[in-house]
């Protein structure tokens, strides 16, 4: 079971955390973080249709570890998507909880980003140019959905289920999941690391309390959708992008 955890994380968010830490060390030893910029959702090709193809392939293949995690949960623990709340049985309630969490975490995220920028501990974020192609916004929304499903299913449903089976204390699962979530955002600076670690702790507590991952997927999708699309529209006014 430990190997299953290692395999899933090594193919996905654990790998991202390692690269993020290395990227952070590269940046922090190069120049002050406040003077650097982190680009998000960059084009993958200068040729539009190949860029679209690469973007869609990237989204599709990034979800393979989710399928692997669901398979391991079913095979080793007898848990299907329904048992971890990854379903559409309660769309209204899940959407309401997701929207509430989005509002609470979104304000905190903006605040930590602003503080990090003011203290020079967070890089400037450069977001996608929405005027690029007609498919830019749909692909960004698909990317937001990809991140939401990948992170919440793996960080909560998969990791917590396997942790319980290994008799790991809930507080240790909560702390480990939160720190890992912060780690794969560390490439953006200290602010996003702290913000995402706090978000991981809050989401983890909500999942432990109610046992449904879908509201957290919805909240995460809304956060990323605003981050990818909304900030491209209002970003220059609040110091993001431009």
Question: What residue spans do the PLM features occupy?
Answer:
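Generic hydrophobic, helix-prone segments enriched in Leu/Val/Ile
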Residues: 21, 25, 52-57, 91-95, ...
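Residue-level signature of transmembrane alpha-helical entry/exit and packing/kink sites
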Residues: 1-8, 51-63, 93-98, 136-140, ...
């Amino acid at each position: 079971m430990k190997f299953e955890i290692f395999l899933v994380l090594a193919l996905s968010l654990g790998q991202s955390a390692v690269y993020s830490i290395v990227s952070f060390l590269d940046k922090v030893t190069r120049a002050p973080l406040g003077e650097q910029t982190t680009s998000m959702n960059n084009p993958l090709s200068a040729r539009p249709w190949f860029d679209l193809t690469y973007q869609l392939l990237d989204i599709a293949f990034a979800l393979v570890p989710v399928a692997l995690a669901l398979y391991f949960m079913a095979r080793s623990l007898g848990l299907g998507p329904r048992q971890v709340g990854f379903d559409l049985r309660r769309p209204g309630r899940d959407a309401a909880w997701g929207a509430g969490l989005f509002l609470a975490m979104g304000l905190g995220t903006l605040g930590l980003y602003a503080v990090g920028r003011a203290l020079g501990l967070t890089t400037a974020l450069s977001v996608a140019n929405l005027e690029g192609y007609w498919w830019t916004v749909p692909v960004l929304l698909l990317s937001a959905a990809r991140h939401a499903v990948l992170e919440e299913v793996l960080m909560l449903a998969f990791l917590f289920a396997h942790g319980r089976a290994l008799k790991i204390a809930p507080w240790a699962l909560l702390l480990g999941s939160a720190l890992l979530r912060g780690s794969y955002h560390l490439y953006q600076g200290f602010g996003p690391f702290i913000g995402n670690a706090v978000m991981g702790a809050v989401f983890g507590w909500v999942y432990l309390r109610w046992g449904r991952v879908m509201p957290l997927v919805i909240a995460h999708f809304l956060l990323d959708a605003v981050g990818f699309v909304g900030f491209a529209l209002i970003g220059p006014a609040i110091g993001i992008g431009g």
